């Protein structure tokens, strides 16, 4: 395998560059990187790429038995289609579940008082369980009869 890596460098020659980091460029803090990761996770799981390409409406509508138009947030019976609000709601749940796991992880720090540890555990479990069960409710709204045992 080493010979395969060496073959291109038999022909190519690496330049002798002395590159320096610009003085205005600083390493971002851990919380800045974390915030960027969470925001990008929220946008990607919300289907921002799908929303840009397909341009779906923000909410849909259906006609009830009296002939009135009623707004609906979920595009039922379509697994590969979504309204914008549906994607944002699902993305919020996924992000809340992920933050719940991070809160549960942070509760294991050795220097946290007992009351704060209990509160972090409670909030973490609530976030994870709420996001899980609400995602199941969303799946029942999206595909009626799918998770019915």
Swiss-Prot record:
It is a multi-pass membrane protein. GO terms for cellular component: endoplasmic reticulum membrane; oligosaccharyltransferase complex; oligosaccharyltransferase complex A. Keywords: Endoplasmic reticulum, Membrane, Transmembrane, Transmembrane helix. The keyword Membrane applies. GO terms for biological process: co-translational protein modification; protein N-linked glycosylation; protein N-linked glycosylation via asparagine. It is found in: Endoplasmic reticulum; Membrane. It comes from the Eukaryota. Its main location: endoplasmic reticulum. Pathway: Protein modification; protein glycosylation. Disulfide bonds: none annotated. Residues 1-32, 105-117 are cytoplasmic. Changing residue 9 to L: In a breast cancer sample; somatic mutation. Component of STT3A-containing oligosaccharyl transferase (OST-A) complex. STT3A-containing complex assembly occurs through the formation of 3 subcomplexes. Subcomplex 1 contains RPN1 and TMEM258, subcomplex 2 contains the STT3A-specific subunits STT3A, DC2/OSTC, and KCP2 as well as the core subunit OST4, and subcomplex 3 contains RPN2, DAD1, and OST48. The OST-A complex can form stable complexes with the Sec61 complex or with both the Sec61 and TRAP complexes. Interacts with PSEN1 and NCSTN; indicative for an association with the gamma-secretase complex. Belongs to the OSTC family. This is Oligosaccharyltransferase complex subunit OSTC.
